[in-house]
A protein has these predicted regions:
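Conserved N-terminal segment of class I S-adenosyl-L-methionine
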Residues: 1-107, 114, 118, 131, ...
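S-adenosyl-L-methionine-dependent methyltransferase catalytic module, highlighting the catalytic core
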Residues: 22-31, 114-116, 125-136, 143-218
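Short conserved AdoMet
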Residues: 45, 65-69, 125, 139, ...
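Short glycine-centered segments of the SAM/dcSAM-binding site in methyltransferase folds
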Residues: 49, 142-143
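Short amphipathic alpha-helical "recognition" segments used for binding
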Residues: 56, 61, 122, 126, ...
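A short linear boundary/processing microfeature
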Residues: 87-90, 140, 163-164
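Active-site micro-motifs of SAM-dependent methyltransferase domains
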Residues: 105, 122, 153
Length: 218
């Protein structure tokens, strides 16, 4: 409980903070969302029910909300949940709801066709616990997709360069790890044999995906 409380406080501070660096991050997120949408649309249709874990402002999934049946977003930060909810209201998106929840032990009882997270898994000491929660939320035949920064990319270099205390403010997120393909697949295989990894193209974007598929019958 203490660890979850500490983590909630860290992310609360991140989502409340605004500045020049955060404006740059917003621009980068908009750029990445263009490529993420191409990937997510492979999994979605008008009947899809979608859950986003660690949704933040949910800018990506809200942009896809008109193309699906429903969207539920959860985050440990009430500031992030409030911002996502306000964005949905302002843009008259009626099929999206947001709630505060802990991605290591979700209170949700509903199951979904598609479970998504963007830049979430790498912030946890035990990523397998979080990956299992993604899988647990799936309907039979559903798919979970988790995106993380690739270990051998500019993301890692940026992180390492900002480790000195005086430069720490130039890394806008909490502490994290970086996965290569083998390590990320090992996490997935602890959850289900129906796991695979693949890269976001173009490769210089430095993003790798973990896909977890739930069989129709188990």
């Amino acid at each position: 409980m203490q660890k979850s409380t500490e983590q909630a406080g860290e992310w609360q501070e991140i989502w409340e903070r605004r500045g020049a660096l955060d404006s740059f991050i917003d621009w980068g997120r908009t750029t990445y969302n263009h490529f993420f949408r191409r990937v997510l649309r492979r999994y979605l249709n008008t009947d899809s029910t979608v859950l986003e874990l660690g949704c933040g402002r949910a800018s990506l999934t809200l942009s896809l909300a008109p193309e699906i049946t429903s969207l539920v977003g959860v985050d440990i930060s009430d500031v992030a949940v409030q911002q996502a909810s306000e964005f949905a209201r302002e843009h008259h998106i009626l099929n999206a709801t947001f709630a505060i929840d802990d991605c290591t032990k979700l209170a949700l009882t509903e199951k979904f066709d598609f479970v998504w997270s963007q830049g979430l898994l790498e912030h946890f000491e035990d990523p397998i616990v979080v990956a299992r929660e993604h899988y647990r939320m799936l309907k039979p035949g559903g798919t979970a997709l988790l995106s993380v920064p690739y270990r051998y990319s500019y993301h890692t270099l940026w992180y390492l360069l900002t480790r000195p205390k005086m430069l720490r403010r130039f890394w806008p997120w909490t502490e994290q790890r970086f996965f290569n393909g083998r390590q990320l697949l090992a996490v997935g295989k602890e959850v289900t044999p129906y796991a695979r990894v693949f890269f976001l193209h173009p490769l210089p974007l430095g993003i790798i995906f973990l896909e977890l598929r739930r069989p129709v019958t188990e």
